[in-house]
Amino acid sequence: LENYPAPLSPSLQLLDAQDLQASRDRSLLLLGGYLGFGLLVLFLGWVHVRLYGDRVFVAYVSYVACMLGFQVAFTGLGGLFFWPQHWVWNDTAPALFMLWLTASGIWFVREVSALQRHSRTLYRLATFWSLFGFAYPALYFMFLSPAAFKLLNLYGLLSVLLSMGLCIWAWRKGEVHAGWTALGFLPLHLAYPFPALRSAGLLPDSWATQYAVLIGSAIEIPLLLYILHRRAKDFNENSARMRVSDSTDPRTGRP
């Protein structure tokens, strides 16, 4: 068995027909539940876009959409149900959505950390890093070499470190919700090494390498939405207090 450009790390199991069918049923139930939950969170995120008109929610919705696309492609659900006849797309979709997921994640971090207000250098770095992730699939599929695959994995690893670093830096600058966002990312970042090590050929294919990111993201995306909801609510309350203060006579306390 050979796979290109990613190494193949199969694990062998002996199952009878009944056990195989039971395993398939459990997997489909898990994936179906995840997809339905993810679509619900995506809808709620879009409601917040319409409600608050904040760019951070647009970035969040893009991040969740790419996450769902990645999970559908990576777990094989897409090839089984959504595009069974399109084998070329089935082969390219996991890498494409992985890069777009990472790029949209950095875009989301850029917005939630308010980098433009604190450091134009870091703002430009995050912008460039995100744009690179959106554009790199064109180069990756053009060359499709082991070197291009290593660069893809390196981009994913460095993006994990960059996202946490930017959130913690912004938190120390006074962006309280950036610190909470760093904690919200933890479930996914702790799950990331399992598929990454499998892609590098260091771990065999297993339940953990297949579903760790799915479980991590199922915890992460509602946490991030709640953090963003609290952020928007706090900003609105602060804006309301400032409007009242500006319209009040400081000597009499009356409008």
Segments the model singles out, each with a brief description of its role:
Residues 1-43, 49-50, 54-57, 75, ...:
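Membrane-proximal, cysteine-centered motifs at transmembrane boundaries in secretory-pathway
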Residues 53, 65, 109, 252:
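Conserved hydrophobic/aromatic pocket- or pore-lining residues that grip, position, or stack substrates
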Residues 59-66:
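Structural signature of the GPCR N-terminal helical module
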Residues 66-111, 116-240:
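Interfacial "cap-and-anchor" motif at the non-cytosolic start of specific transmembrane alpha-helices
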Residues 242-255:
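Conserved nucleotide-binding and Mg2+-coordinating catalytic segments in signaling enzymes
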